[in-house]
Amino acid sequence: MKLSAELKSFQKRLGHQFNQPALLAQAVTHASMSTANRGDNQRMEFLGDRVLGLVMAEALLRLDNNATEGQLAPRFNALVRKETCADVAREIDLGAVLRLGRSEMLSGGRRKQALLGDAIEAVIAAVYQDAGFDAARALILRLWGDRVHEVEEDARDPKTALQEWAQARGLQPPRYEEVSRKGPDHAPIFTISVRISTGETDQATAGSKRQAEQAAAQALLAKLETSG
């Protein structure tokens, strides 16, 4: 099959020329757009998640020969969580080429964290099926970039620290809510609030939901530490 101009442009952003273009077409097709003659990316997302996990586990082991399983687990989780996958998807503007059904399109599907995270995993699976594990690994390490090297510092991030603070006091996990989203699709600004079960709350604004959640958690932690 021939790719559309949009998908050809996306191939360049991705840095992989597909030998089997149909794999890429399926990887960007959401279940809301699938038909009897055109599959969706759900099964590919399942495979891509496993390929991503293997690549990241291998990379972390190579970076730190002395790390324990307890140290590696939070680093691994930080690299493969949906927020990180969605951030990577945004960096290559994957949302612009997603094939969505009308209802999903109208509800802002191109910006949804879950859809973007699933789609980048499906794209990883497409590269794996098209060119093998080495090609998929090279793609992942290039797209994730410095995140792999910086994750050690971020393993115990403010969200994790706040959750541990709450658990140590027998409280429910903190709750995060989107207060507002402003700005254009390519440069959104999110305001996120966080609340713990004793009623304390704070909020923060940033260019991604994850960054805003982390900043809100940091602000609330600072407030809790000040109040004793």
Curated annotation (Swiss-Prot):
Pfam families reported for this sequence: dsrm (PF00035), Ribonucleas_3_3 (PF14622)
Cofactor(s) essential for the protein: Mg(2+)
GO cellular component: a single term: cytoplasm
Record keywords: Cytoplasm, Endonuclease, Hydrolase, Magnesium, Metal-binding, mRNA processing, Nuclease, RNA-binding, rRNA processing, rRNA-binding, tRNA processing
Binding positions (Mg(2+)): E45, D118, E121
Domain DRBM: 157-226
EC number: 3.1.26.3
CDD domains: DSRM_RNAse_III_family, RIBOc
Subcellular location: Cytoplasm
Active site feature: D49, E121
Catalysed transformations (reactions): Endonucleolytic cleavage to 5'-phosphomonoester
PROSITE patterns: DS_RBD (PS50137), RNASE_3_1 (PS00517), RNASE_3_2 (PS50142)
Gene3D superfamilies: 3.30.160.20, Ribonuclease III domain
Broad class of enzyme this protein falls into: hydrolase
UniProt subunit comment: Homodimer.
Function according to Swiss-Prot or TrEMBL: Digests double-stranded RNA. Involved in the processing of primary rRNA transcript to yield the immediate precursors to the large and small rRNAs (23S and 16S). Processes some mRNAs, and tRNAs when they are encoded in the rRNA operon. Processes pre-crRNA and tracrRNA of type II CRISPR loci if present in the organism.
Protein name: Ribonuclease 3
